């Protein structure tokens, strides 16, 4: 089933969780999350950290348990799988890029044909490396901004 984890994947998540849970109490608090994110170059305010925790903290205790962490990981995985399916639907020739022609055909297939200028603008907006087509990373970045 989409979003489900294998025992090996769950073990990897447990290892990652334990690395962030520096006091070993079985939960991740705002201080631990902040330190882990800071190590990756992301500095979040206390309010941002609390908001991030609240999005995962289903029991409302202000901390993330391993079960809450796993639930969030499964949701993220399912979202990623949906994104990959959407990209493949647009990348009709399977070469890893969406061209203007593929976008035109896909939009027409969805019953939403668009004028050439709008198609060109959509590709230009998403095309970070300016090669005239959109790769998966550019596609994901574009959707994350919406």
Swiss-Prot record:
Modified residues (N-acetylalanine): 2
A single BP term in Gene Ontology: epidermis development
SUPFAM superfamilies assigned: EF-hand
PROSITE patterns: EF_HAND_1, EF_HAND_2
Binding-site residues for Ca(2+) 4, renumbered to this chain: 127, 129, 131, 133, 138
GO CC term (a single one): cytoplasm
Domain EF-hand: 8-43, 44-74, 78-113, 114-146
Binding site residues for Ca(2+) 3: 91, 93, 95, 97, 102
GO molecular function list: calcium ion binding; enzyme regulator activity
Summary of the tissues where the protein is detected: Particularly abundant in the epidermis where its expression is directly related to keratinocyte differentiation. Very low expression in lung.
UniProt-listed Pfam families: EF-hand_7 (PF13499)
Keywords (A to Z) from UniProt: Acetylation, Calcium, Metal-binding, Repeat
Chain positions recorded as Ca(2+) 2 binding sites: 57, 59, 61, 63, 68
Annotated TM spans: none
Domain of life, source organism: Eukaryota
Binding residues for Ca(2+) 1: 21, 23, 25, 27, 32
Record note on quaternary structure: Associates with transglutaminase 3.
Protein function: Binds calcium. May be involved in terminal differentiation of keratinocytes.
Record-given protein name: Calmodulin-like protein 5
Gene encoding the protein: CALML5
């Amino acid at each position: 089933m989409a979003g489900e984890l294998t025992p090996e994947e769950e073990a990897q998540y447990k290892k990652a969780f334990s690395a962030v849970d520096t006091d070993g109490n079985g939960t991740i608090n705002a201080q631990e999350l902040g330190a882990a994110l800071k190590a990756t170059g992301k500095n979040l305010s206390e309010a941002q950290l609390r908001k991030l925790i609240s999005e995962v903290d289903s029991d409302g205790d202000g901390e993330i348990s391993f079960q809450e962490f796993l639930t969030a990981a499964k949701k993220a995985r399912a979202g990623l799988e949906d994104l990959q399916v959407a990209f493949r639907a647009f990348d009709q020739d399977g070469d890893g890029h969406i061209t203007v022609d593929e976008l035109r055909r896909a939009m027409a297939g969805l019953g939403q044909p668009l004028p050439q200028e709008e198609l060109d603008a959509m590709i230009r907006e998403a095309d970070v490396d300016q090669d005239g087509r959109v790769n998966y990373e550019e596609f994901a970045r574009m959707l994350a901004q919406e």
